[in-house]
């Protein structure tokens, strides 16, 4: 697992989560291709992930970064943490995330940590169950973050005040 991060001109934080080598066997030998999984975020609630494939690692990473910028979502954060505890799953990967008090930090493993860091979450407790395949863990984390709503948006949908729903 690689954890490469850098800042770009647009103000996005980019993290390389995984590079995988795949070999296709043909008559003349093996053909190697590389798959890259990246996450991109602005540190203020916008986050995206992407996958790229190429015969060379830098090209695969570049394709993944472009895909991640096209696939961005907005996450409603509660200051530096999540709104509420949540569970999410993708394939055999299951993730659990819960808000944490100030000063806790990001207590999460591998691929989940990368997503939460670039999203701007600074205090969270998270656990991954089942498969720890980085692709499925990132998908499951995104499903959870995408479904999270602020109390203000829930109240607006119901036509009530925030105090009435809390």
UniProtKB/Swiss-Prot annotation:
InterPro entries, per the entry: Ribosomal_Su5_D2-typ_SF, Ribosomal_uS5, Ribosomal_uS5_bac-type, Ribosomal_uS5_C, Ribosomal_uS5_N, Ribosomal_uS5_N_CS, Ribsml_uS5_D2-typ_fold_subgr
Keywords on this record? Ribonucleoprotein, Ribosomal protein, RNA-binding, rRNA-binding
Concerning Pfam families, the annotation shows:
Ribosomal_S5, Ribosomal_S5_C
Q: Where is the S5 DRBM domain?
A: 12-75
Gene Ontology CC annotation, any one = small ribosomal subunit
Any one GO biological process? translation
Q: What's an example of a GO molecular-function annotation for this chain?
A: rRNA binding
Q: Which NCBIfam families match?
A: rpsE_bact (TIGR01021)
Report the family membership.
Answer: Belongs to the universal ribosomal protein uS5 family.
Function of this protein? Answer: With S4 and S12 plays an important role in translational accuracy.
Please give the PANTHER family that the UniProt record associates with this protein: S5 DRBM DOMAIN-CONTAINING PROTEIN
| Comment on protein domains | The N-terminal domain interacts with the head of the 30S subunit; the C-terminal domain interacts with the body and contacts protein S4. The interaction surface between S4 and S5 is involved in control of translational fidelity.
Q: Which HAMAP family match?
A: Ribosomal_uS5_B
Q: How does it assemble?
A: Part of the 30S ribosomal subunit. Contacts proteins S4 and S8.
Q: What is this protein called?
A: Small ribosomal subunit protein uS5
Please tell me the species this chain comes from.
Pseudomonas savastanoi pv. phaseolicola (strain 1448A / Race 6)
